[in-house]
């Protein structure tokens, strides 16, 4: 069957990464197939060797010999034949077939070859439970179902590795259990106890630090054991017992939460008293709508309020005294300096109280100012009486004669330059008058005398 593959595939099957082969079944030599009959499959995996004296070699080919044989013939030793194709994989497959045949003889009514082959696979994952345990779910969740792997003759022992896997330094020397013993440690039946936080100390999925765990059921420390150490459920939050609670613990929490809010309310109430309001007279403080009256909570606040009231009263008295002194110094003639022009309301609307406020003052009513005549921009002369005054008033109202409007009546304009300096435009030079050509005047053409009226023509 394997003859159709090329020779390069032989190195794949011949290479053996393991140094030694522990015996799979007690009593059999390591590295050799079991000396039993293979039935109809006997010739499938037997080596194809023509020399009966040369036993088939197992494992890697010696370094001194090549797989294809030596190219130089040697007459002193028999020629090397092509070695057999037995390797570790052949032995493993043949052994698995043998076990399956023996199992089918005892349990002929069950056909489950897949579950039988899985426990025998070598590797760090260990063995899986056979089909007998998986077919009975009651044995998985009860304490009676957690039997030792040695009870099954076709399952490897917990303390033994695969038949072709030797123990090394990086692999845990302790075996892995083949049954789901952790499910038997649950408090309730089936999956109802998955939420229980209590696990058996000897279970496979229990913690490493759990006391009383036997070595065979302890969690392995190798990195592959992380898959087995993970719990089946997430750890649930454990509510503290009633004894751990104190009767006053629940009542203290609302008080602690209320303290910041009370402090904030006090700060909001004290805020108007700590900062002065803008655009508000200190003598007449106004309270905001919905705000309580003055509530002095501390002695410092009271002292500040008293000082503010005293300062406001002193400022009002000083302002009144300054106004009276200014009115006495200026007198009734300078009262217009004290009264500022009232500002008009928005959009120049009517506001008689604001405009008449200055005239209703007591000082204005007591001594009103004297109305002064408007200033004159000309000197006052003697007033004329009689008919001459009317003519003078008429002439005074007329506009003076402008030289540009009346050029004939206007005197000649003065020279632009000084009188001592010669002016170029004052007179025409004589050379220009003598050298100028005479004006060209066309002579009139002689015209024929006009005709008199003659007889009318017939054709017209």
From Swiss-Prot:
Alphabetical list of Pfam families matching this protein: Auts2
Region named Disordered: 40-79, 205-311, 406-460
Keywords: Isopeptide bond, Methylation, Phosphoprotein, Ubl conjugation
Residues bearing PTM Asymmetric dimethylarginine: 229, 239
Bias-annotated ranges (Basic and acidic residues): 248-272, 288-311
InterPro entries associated with the record: AUTS2 (IPR023246)
Cross-link Glycyl lysine isopeptide (Lys-Gly) (interchain with G-Cter in SUMO2) placement: 8
Composition bias type Pro residues, residue spans: 212-223, 436-453
Presence of keyword Ligase: no
Modified residues (Phosphoserine): 281
Keyword Transport attributed: no
Protein name: Probable fibrosin-1
Organism: Homo sapiens (Human)
Gene this chain is encoded by: FBRS
């Amino acid at each position: 069957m394997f003859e159709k593959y090329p020779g390069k595939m032989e190195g794949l099957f011949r290479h053996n990464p393991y140094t030694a082969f522990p015996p799979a079944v007690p009593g059999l030599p390591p590295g050799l197939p079991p000396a039993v009959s293979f039935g109809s499959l006997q010739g499938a995996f037997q080596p194809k060797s023509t020399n009966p004296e040369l036993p088939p070699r197992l494992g890697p080919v010696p370094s001194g010999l090549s797989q294809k044989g030596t190219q130089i013939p040697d007459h002193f030793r028999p020629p090397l034949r092509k070695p057999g194709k037995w390797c570790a994989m052949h032995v493993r497959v043949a052994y698995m077939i043998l076990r399956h045949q023996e199992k089918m003889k005892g349990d002929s009514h069950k056909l489950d070859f897949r579950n039988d082959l899985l426990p025998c696979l070598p590797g760090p994952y260990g063995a899986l439970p056979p089909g007998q345990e998986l077919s009975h779910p009651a044995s998985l969740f009860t304490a009676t179902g957690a039997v030792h792997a040695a009870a099954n003759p076709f399952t490897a022992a917990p303390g033994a590795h695969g038949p072709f896997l030797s123990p090394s330094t990086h692999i845990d020397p302790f075996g892995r259990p083949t049954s789901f013993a952790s499910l038997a440690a649950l408090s309730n039946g089936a999956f109802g106890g998955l939420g229980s936080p209590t696990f058996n100390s000897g279970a496979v999925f229990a913690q490493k630090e759990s006391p009383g765990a036997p070595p065979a059921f302890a969690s392995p420390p190798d990195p592959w054991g992380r898959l087995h150490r993970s719990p089946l459920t997430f750890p649930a939050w454990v509510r503290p017992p009633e004894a751990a609670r104190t009767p006053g613990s629940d009542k203290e929490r609302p008080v602690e939460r209320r303290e910041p809010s009370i402090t904030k309310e006090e700060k909001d109430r004290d805020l108007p008293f700590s900062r002065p309001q803008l655009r508000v007279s200190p003598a007449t403080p106004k309270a905001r709508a919905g705000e309580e009256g003055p509530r002095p909570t501390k002695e410092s606040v009271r002292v500040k309020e008293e000082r503010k009231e005293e300062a406001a009263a002193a400022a009002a008295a000083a302002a009144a005294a300054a106004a009276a002194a200014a009115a006495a110094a200026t007198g009734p003639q300078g009262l217009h300096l004290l009264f500022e022009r009232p500002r008009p309301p928005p959009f120049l609307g009517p506001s008689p109280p604001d405009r008449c406020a200055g005239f209703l003052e007591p000082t204005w009513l007591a001594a009103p100012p004297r109305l002064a005549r408007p200033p004159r921009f000309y000197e006052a002369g003697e007033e004329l009486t009689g008919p001459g005054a009317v003519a003078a008033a008429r002439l005074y109202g007329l506009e003076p004669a402008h030289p540009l409007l009346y050029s004939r009546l206007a005197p000649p304009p003065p020279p632009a330059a000084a009188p001592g300096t010669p002016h170029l435009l004052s007179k025409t030079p004589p050379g220009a008058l003598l050298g100028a050509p005479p004006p060209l005047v066309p002579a009139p053409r002689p015209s024929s005398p006009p005709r008199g009226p003659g007889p009318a023509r017939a054709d017209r």
